[in-house]
């Protein structure tokens, strides 16, 4: 009969440790990003990496973790929702921003010399 209480005490100890550890893990799930600003007909506000004043879209990551935009799309055409796909490993830092230039002249690697993404519209 002494083995049963000993086993029960062991199980109780394991459960107590498990219950104490669960709240200590910081499991953060990234939510969606936000299109926070759009500049159409840019003539003097912000230059792209080629020195041109192109239209641009600002995307904000309100999450406390990095957000990878790989697999996401931007478009200016409701009939073509996958018109421009973000390059792989397009990461926005926690609470950070990304400017995407809508030049219609997508660079071969989708970014300009300064690393700014450029769309094909």
Predicted regions and their residues:
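Short, intrinsically disordered low-complexity segments
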Residues: 1-2, 11, 109, 117
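Bacterial N-terminal signal peptides that target proteins for export
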Residues: 2-15, 24-25
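C-terminal segment of classical bacterial N-terminal signal peptides
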Residues: 21-29
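Activation on beta-sandwich/Ig-like modules and their edge loops
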Residues: 29-121
């Amino acid at each position: 009969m002494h083995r049963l209480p000993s086993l029960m005490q062991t199980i109780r100890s394991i459960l107590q440790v498990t219950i104490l550890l669960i709240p200590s893990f910081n499991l953060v799930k990234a939510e969606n990003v936000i299109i926070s600003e759009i500049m159409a007909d840019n003539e003097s506000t912000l230059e792209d990496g080629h020195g041109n004043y192109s239209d641009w879209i600002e995307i904000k990551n309100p999450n406390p973790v990095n957000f990878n935009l790989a697999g996401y799309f931007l478009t200016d055409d409701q009939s073509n929702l996958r018109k421009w796909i973000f390059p792989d490993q397009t990461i926005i830092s926690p609470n950070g921003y990304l400017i995407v230039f809508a030049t219609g002249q997508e660079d071969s690697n989708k970014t300009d010399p300064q690393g700014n993404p450029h769309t094909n519209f």
